[in-house]
Amino acid sequence: MRKIFIGCLLLVALAANAHSAQQPSTGVPSKLVKVRDDFFMIENINATVADIGSYGGNIAVYLTDEGVVLVDSKNERTHDDVVAKVRSLTDKPIKYVVLTHNHGDHAGGAPKMQAIGATILISVNDRENMARAPNVAWVPQFGYVGRAQLVMGGKEVRLYEVRGHTRGDTAAYFPAARVVAMGDLLTTSEDIPLIVNYPDGGSWMDWSKSVDEILQLDFDVAIPGHGPMVTKQQVVNIRNKMVAIRERVRTMNREKKTQQEITDTLIKEFNWGMGPSAGNVPAMMQELR
């Protein structure tokens, strides 16, 4: 039996080895990585900023006797690759796609998933972010607020709405598998820095609070938005680094340091503050004043 228990749900109408089975070749640089017997990750091999728009982020794949739950959908271009990889694991239908947030490299493939019968879930806050984007053509039918629960084939998925990368990030927790999928609350690729999206309501102050909340969950493996999966201790290490960066900015703000001085210090001390993260520096300075 499939169930959705969404106490706060609003109906908004309108390190493991690559999977050993033969993986379909579709021209998309991705691979299946086995996490558990019933849990896999579709990892973008080219985890670089230049390839985000073309190939999207990671996807979590949870297998049940009644169907498949995905976390994130990459983008429209990668749809056939995602479906082929799921089909290499099971002939059960993709029943649910949980979107960790509204950005196209994670949510862009959702319309095609809906077209093949999947129900799409996202937080109401990030649904609203999606709806106000220029020239928006589609938004998910269902949104939730705060907490939600999916049960399908006797397996549970718990959804936690938190603020960090955006104002309505979703962390998807799989208790039986001891896995949490965090979207862009967590990135582990050396080429894609962890950043906050301020235009979509993100916050570095709330990011650490949200990660601390997630760390209270009983998990062994975290699936990031980009990059390889990591252990819980590695999440702690990343959290501590980003808090150290934040507090360094706070201190230098008080010392009346310039943006360039702060940026130079962050690059030197943390190897952070260049490339995509450079745009976070002035916004972080403003948030921490």
PLM feature spans:
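Accessory terminal helices/loops
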Residues: 15, 19-24, 215-218, 229-289
